[in-house]
Amino acid sequence: MSIEAISLHKKFGRVHAVRDLSFHIEAGEFIGLVGPNGAGKSTTIKMLTGQLLPTSGSVHICGVDMSTHPNEGRSELGYVPEFPELYTYLSAREMISFVVDIRGRGDVEWALSLTGLGDDADRLIREYSQGMRRKTAIACALVAKPKVLILDEALNGLDPPSVERVLRALDEVRAQGTAVVLSTHVLDTLEKIATRIIMLKDGSIEHDCLPSALKDIRNQFG
């Protein structure tokens, strides 16, 4: 099992942001994590990636408890935050190579090709558009071919051709056995690629279903 969330609760003072959240995600699954603003998506992702400790409950990445052994769990985890931080004085090739050096594995040219950055790989990141910066962050997350890949609103700022390119990249790593979790408001995207949809509402799971149920879910977004 790639990801297991067990009875997750997260409170911030009196605010109960996540309530009794439980699910498991197998290798090769592509999960679309959706929900209105304030549903608990970002809090959930931060607990999955070990950035936030749950008030109660636990997260396991590839069998590793993220509360007690976060570094071991992160060794099998690729992550793209909603607002990625990059070293803009580097080129994309240098940035991705830096990640490979840290992780101790990875194929820079494969990641550049997969995300469509090859022609611009040696330009400085500070010269990039927001969309190209986001693709660089995605390339950094998948270069080491992690067993789990988690992306928080990673399609924001991408034009339609770039969205299609990124989706193909994510589908390729999923087909190789990576468990992918994509938080997004772009529901049409999920119909093309997701194997499951998890919809949060008020910090709890409202739906855990197949993409074919997206029509009904879309109505709940208003």
Show which residues each predicted segment covers.
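Conserved ABC ATPase "signature" region
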Residues: 97, 104-120
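Conserved ABC transporter NBD signature motif
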Residues: 57-68, 72-73
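Hydrophobic anchor residue at the start of the ABC signature
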Residues: 138
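Helix-to-loop junction immediately C-terminal to a conserved catalytic motif
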Residues: 49
